[in-house]
Structures are given as C-alpha cells and as structure tokens.
Amino acid sequence: MTEVTKNDFTEEGKIVRKIRSFVRREGRLTKGQEGAIQECWPSMGIDFVEQMLDWNEVFGNNNPVVLEIGFGMGASLVEMAKNAPEKNFLGIEVHRPGVGACLAAAKEAGVTNLRVMCHDAVEVFESMIPDSSVNTLQLFFPDPWHKARHHKRRIVKAEFAEMIRPKLIQGGIFHMATDWENYSEHMIEVMNAAPGYENIATDGDFIPRPDERPLTKFEARGHRLGHGVWDIKFRRNA
C-alpha cells in the first residue's frame, strides 16, 4: 500500500498549494485494521498510479461501477456491495484506519465486488478514472466546513462538478447526502449552475433517502433527535 502526493508547479518551479477538502488525521490503526490491510490489500486494494484503470482488469467483469468518495469506516459501503453483487464498488478514503475497518468488514461479509484506495480522490479522478465509465458517484456526509471562511474547502464546488462529469456515463448519477442544511443548499446551487447536469427530484430540490443508501447508526440517532438529512441526485445529461 503506497501513498503518493502529486504537486503542481509554477513556471518558476514553485509548488502550487492545493486547497484540500479534508484534513489528514492519521489516527492509530487497531491490530484488526492493520491486519486487514496486510491481508486484504493485495486482493482488494488499489495503489495510486498515474495510469487509467481498466475496470475489467480490476473486477474481472464489466458490471456497472459505483464509486464512493470518503467512505469513513466503510460499513455502509460494504453493506451496499453485499446487497448489490451485480455491481462493482470502488471506495476512496484518505484515512488509513477507515480503510482498515472497511477491509475487515468486507472480509467478514465475504464481498468480492469491492475495491478500495487510500488517496486524495481528486487526484485519483484526474489520473486513474476513465471517461464515461462510472455509473454512480456517491458522496455521503462530506465535511461541511460550516464556518464561512472555510467554505472554499468544501469538495462540492464548480471545479469539482466539472471534473467528475466526463467520468460519469451518459445518464450517470451523482448522489450526495448531508446532514447540514446549509451545505445541502450549497450543493444544489453549485450543481444547478454546473453545465451538463439535471436534478432528478420532481421539485428540483431533494429526494427521499433511497433504499440503496443504508441508514447509518449516526443518521438513525440524528433522526431520533429531530435532525434532518438531505439526499440529492443529479444526472449527467450532456
């Protein structure tokens, strides 16, 4: 399992600092997480390289691809993969404890249609995801960066929408979910302004939680406390 950081440079050779949507908090791996990475990475892990993936080589078939950015500890992603063996799933997460937990859960569940990466998703999209190859892109509960001065760090912005669109198939879905109402409004504003997308909600707003997105313990607790969760789906139409 390798980690590569790719930098851009000015004409003078100075490094251009990128604004990232995440803060890397390594945390300490449990023995179980570390063991899962050592055991499962050769078969389920994908190292970052500057070369486009061949999904047939990765999964051994041409089933539809579902890609999730920031899967946390991976419980929901593993459940989705287990419930949809006719699809292929790729999860991208920057925090190694989450990657280890996901691999451990995948092994226990016996899923074979899941692969994971531990790298910055933007760089993965730029260097490894082929155009018109992703059926569904999932972004569930990204960091809301709720302070106004930090909004520039939000992953959902015009540049991101433009970057991911060619990676989706025609008719492909970008599915977002957040428990911050302000961020949900921001998501819709950004995506409505982005060319080549349409909101699939009949009222042009939000959709009920789809059955395919598992209800997390965190989300269930939020419901009990009266907290809202907003699901948004945009379709590539150009």
Curated annotation (Swiss-Prot):
Keywords tagged on the record: Methyltransferase, S-adenosyl-L-methionine, Transferase, tRNA processing
GO molecular function, one term: tRNA (guanine(46)-N7)-methyltransferase activity
Ligand binding (S-adenosyl-L-methionine): E68, E93, D120, D143
Enzyme Commission number(s): 2.1.1.33
Task performed by this protein: Catalyzes the formation of N(7)-methylguanine at position 46 (m7G46) in tRNA.
Positions bound to substrate: K147, D179, T216, K217, F218, E219
Lineage, uppermost ranks: Bacteria, Pseudomonadati, Pseudomonadota, Gammaproteobacteria, Vibrionales
UniProt-listed HAMAP family: tRNA_methyltr_TrmB
GO cellular component, one term: tRNA methyltransferase complex
Primary gene name: trmB
NCBIfam families attached to this UniProt entry: tRNA (guanosine(46)-N7)-methyltransferase TrmB (TIGR00091)
Naturally occurring in which organism (per UniProt): Aliivibrio fischeri (strain MJ11) (Vibrio fischeri)
Similarity section: Belongs to the class I-like SAM-binding methyltransferase superfamily. TrmB family.
Gene3D superfamilies associated with the record: Vaccinia Virus protein VP39 (3.40.50.150)
Pathway in which the depicted protein is active: tRNA modification; N(7)-methylguanine-tRNA biosynthesis
Reactions listed under catalytic activity: guanosine(46) in tRNA + S-adenosyl-L-methionine = N(7)-methylguanosine(46) in tRNA + S-adenosyl-L-homocysteine
Keyword Cell membrane part of the UniProt annotation: no
This protein's name: tRNA (guanine-N(7)-)-methyltransferase
InterPro entries recorded: SAM-dependent_MTases_sf, tRNA_(Gua-N-7)_MeTrfase_Trmb, tRNA_methyltr_TrmB_bact
Active site, per annotation: D143
